[in-house]
């Protein structure tokens, strides 16, 4: 019987253990997509307690707590920090089988060094006290944790109207050598059917100092803001395509759609598809020109619980997996980008694992131009960010493409404690490849496979995003 969370956690054979300990474990972290608040890095935030760094803003934990019968005031409400932590501690023993159980104890082990103690109501006070004592030390401020975890680069998620002053401050600080770069997230500029679209355009007008009355003016405003992002080192764009649509329209039609929307008239589904497609085509051409990477996160069904949305807002754990078809519209969108000469490096993520093979084969349609792995099938995302989901994604990527060219893991997280997800991913990767060797499905060539693992853990991403590191 294996020991829980030992040094060989998830590594079921000797070859897997060699791959992990000799090639994967010590690789730096290139976290190219996350939701860390850049101001906390700029200010080198000192977190006052475990709740603040660990539970606050974590919708994964809130979903589990609600399922365990925890009242909302102990999740997102007005309860005290210790009360909320105790509610989480009481939930953790019930999460066995959920990745939260693994993540929780990996995060206690690194960076806190808390091992051999499982979080529960019995141990909550001890862990609370030990964790808080460490958080009072400089090594456990925001930057210290990043340095402890051997992070080399993080890409935050930022709106086109953001002034990026925190990124500027970080870049100007010669005492901190981790790259913290903005990522361009222009969803609000193309979601023309969203309730706040008109209000957002006013903010974009102010940020770009351009009056947006026509489609060309919207493009000019976005281009000006991209210049601002580029000046702060941006090399990556990210887009939430909850539903993939495609439509074609000339500029006069796009002007009419925009004018009608600005006057308060909602677009038809066809008009919405035309407008979104036109903006994404324009953006893709700009990304190609600027040598940016574009990411599409596909298939979330958001804000399902309207009562809770009205009560506590979005992004608090009431989203799930959509099952809308995506293949044809995605094919037409990517093909249109390629035809205009503007298909940049692209990473596609799907939330519905049913779509893995769709994405795995779609990226193969647009590879080439001398760039290894130009089109990427992105790592298991959100509800697939767990052992089974990662194995499925990597297995299907290997079967339909080249696993060796995969850019690997990202945290997609709001927490400074989530870097152990890279460790989790690396253990799963090494176990999968070690299993192939064990079954005679891959050669027992430690140099060949070790280099492959090393590349997937760090080097592929470093080369793909072409970001100069310290």
Curated annotation (Swiss-Prot):
Keyword Isomerase assigned: yes
GO annotation, biological process: D-galacturonate catabolic process; D-glucuronate catabolic process
Entry EC number(s): 5.3.1.12
UniProt keyword Isomerase present: yes
Pathway(s) where this gene product acts: Carbohydrate metabolism; pentose and glucuronate interconversion
Gene3D superfamilies: Metal-dependent hydrolases (3.20.20.140), uronate isomerase, domain 2, chain A (1.10.2020.10)
Gene Ontology MF terms: glucuronate isomerase activity
Family: Belongs to the metallo-dependent hydrolases superfamily. Uronate isomerase family.
PANTHER family to which the protein is assigned, alphabetical: URONATE ISOMERASE (PTHR30068:SF4)
Descriptive protein name: Uronate isomerase
Annotated source species: Serratia proteamaculans (strain 568)
Organism taxonomic ancestry: Bacteria, Pseudomonadati, Pseudomonadota, Gammaproteobacteria, Enterobacterales
Gene: uxaC
